[in-house]
Swiss-Prot record:
Its biological purpose: Forms part of the ribosomal stalk which helps the ribosome interact with GTP-bound translation factors.
Similarity comment: family membership: Belongs to the universal ribosomal protein uL11 family.
Presence of keyword rRNA-binding: yes
Name of protein: Large ribosomal subunit protein uL11
Subunit structure: Part of the ribosomal stalk of the 50S ribosomal subunit. Interacts with L10 and the large rRNA to form the base of the stalk. L10 forms an elongated spine to which L12 dimers bind in a sequential fashion forming a multimeric L10(L12)X complex.
UniProt keyword Kinase present: no
Organism: Marinomonas sp. (strain MWYL1)
Signal peptide extent: none
Single biological process term from Gene Ontology: translation
Post-translational events: One or more lysine residues are methylated.
The gene coding this protein: rplK
Gene Ontology cellular component annotations, sorted alphabetically: cytosolic large ribosomal subunit
């Protein structure tokens, strides 16, 4: 018989830097999960990623206090800020542009996020990421 799911926990943890301090410790502790076991497994799984990039993770906690987790790709906003060399997006994205990204940079981001995007082809995925860039106040070159 399959294990009974007790909870789903969604967190953003920096790649390779999971530790028992907040937000990881309290979120897992209230469900009785072994926090150090999660931290070691997460850090091992994300060691190939660039250290410090926020990585969304969905943790499934079962009634016997065991768990599984699935990592997602880094949020598009973080990758866009990194590509444009910014600390944050524009406070007024429609009127005040804060940086520029090219189509080549957008294609790199699409390749990194391919598994989490629902677009059917590269052009549609680039347009999706370009929309996120415009919403952050970035100017997009080479995409209509």
């Amino acid at each position: 018989m399959a294990k009974k799911v007790q909870a789903y926990i969604k967190l953003q943890v920096k790649a390779g830097q999971a530790n028992p301090s907040p937000p990881v410790g309290p979120a897992l502790g209230q469900h009785g999960v072994n926090i150090m076991e999660f931290c070691k497994a997460f850090n091992a799984k994300t060691q190939s990623l660039e250290p410090g990039l926020p990585t969304p993770v969905i943790i499934t906690v079962y009634s016997d206090r065991s768990f599984t987790f699935e990592t997602k790709s880094t949020p598009a906003a973080v990758l866009l800020k990194k590509a444009a060399g910014l600390k944050s997006g524009s406070p007024r994205p429609n009127t005040q542009k804060v940086g520029t990204v090219t189509r080549a940079q957008l294609e790199e981001i699409v390749v990194a996020k391919q598994a989490d995007l629902t677009a059917s082809n590269m052009d549609a995925a680039v347009r999706t990421i370009a929309g996120s860039a415009r919403a952050m106040g970035l100017e997009v070159e080479g995409v209509n």
